């Protein structure tokens, strides 16, 4: 497959990650209940999840009585989601060009998906378009290291210290763009939403094994895995060693623990 754009990189990567992505869902699933809580009583609501992945949020919403529909551009993710949650409607779809009529849904959610899109502003506009008047769009992204995001800050610190970031990969949107106050205001207002609220969701990564932090990169990321694979063998081994040894600073009893809080934005049409 020819990888020419950031979208190509992400699409190809997530097609390959479907069977291993559950190594990170104990982390991402910590945001499910807070996301759904922004809609109040969801029983009977029609909610679209964009970038639905393995379908855990949709499955939780359906269990509470919502009419959930999940879309993802990775067919492998869609098939696994269908298998896990047969009572939910999952389909392949493009977040930047939703195949739904205007004002179709009461709610739209995007849990940690905006950072994987070529044109996230277009996706936010599409969410606004398919929402009914008074509907709500809620998204989550990772907080920056300065705002408590230890986990990804720690991993990238090891990569920067022992690797080379000047590599030949498609240009990517800024990873933390939608955790910035000015960028949030600009994107949400430009899409036409009438109001929004920002909050922080506590999320932590825990594991008994330091190697698990390295495995997260290879099994549950696309661009970070691509950065590592572009390194020399020696640099890659040095990065692995730095991650494993560096985790001792984050040991809590018999396990390792790092924070990676989520920034949650909930906007009303």
Task: Describe these PLM feature segments.
Residues 41-42, 102, 124:
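A short, aliphatic-rich alpha-helical micro-motif
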Residues 46-98, 107, 122:
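Class I SAM-dependent methyltransferase SAM/SAH-binding core
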Residues 106-120, 143:
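A short SAM/SAH-binding and catalytic strip from SAM-dependent methyltransferases
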Residues 1-43, 56-60, 76-80, 84:
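Conserved class I S-adenosyl-L-methionine
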Residues 121, 129-132, 136-208, 224:
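Conserved catalytic/acceptor-binding region of the Class I
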């Amino acid at each position: 497959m020819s990888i020419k754009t950031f979208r190509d990189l992400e699409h190809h990567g997530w097609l390959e990650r479907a069977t291993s992505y559950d190594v990170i869902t104990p982390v991402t699933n910590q945001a499910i209940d807070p996301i759904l809580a922004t809609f109040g009583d969801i029983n009977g609501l029609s909610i679209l999840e964009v970038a639905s992945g393995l379908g855990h949020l949709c499955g939780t919403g359906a269990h509470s009585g919502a009419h959930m529909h999940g879309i993802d551009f990775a067919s492998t993710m869609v098939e696994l989601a269908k298998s896990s949650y047969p009572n939910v409607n999952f389909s392949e779809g493009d977040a930047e060009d939703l195949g739904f009529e205007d004002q179709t849904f009461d709610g739209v959610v995007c849990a940690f998906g905006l950072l994987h899109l070529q044109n996230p502003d277009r996706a936010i506009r599409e969410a606004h378009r398919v929402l009914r008047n008074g509907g709500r769009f809620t998204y989550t992204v990772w907080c920056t290291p300065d705002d408590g995001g230890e986990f990804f800050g720690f991993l990238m610190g090891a990569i920067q210290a022992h690797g080379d970031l000047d590599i030949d990969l498609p240009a990517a949107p800024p990873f933390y763009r939608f955790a910035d106050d000015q960028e949030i205001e600009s994107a949400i207002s430009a899409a036409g939403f009438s109001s929004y609220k920002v909050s922080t969701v506590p999320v932590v990564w825990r594991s008994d094994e330091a190697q698990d932090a390295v495995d997260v990169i290879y099994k549950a990321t696309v661009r970070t895995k691509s950065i590592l694979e572009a390194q020399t063998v020696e640099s890659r081994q040095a990065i692995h060693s730095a991650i494993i040894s560096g985790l001792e600073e984050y040991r809590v009893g018999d396990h390792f623990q790092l924070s990676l809080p989520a920034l949650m934005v909930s906007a009303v049409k």
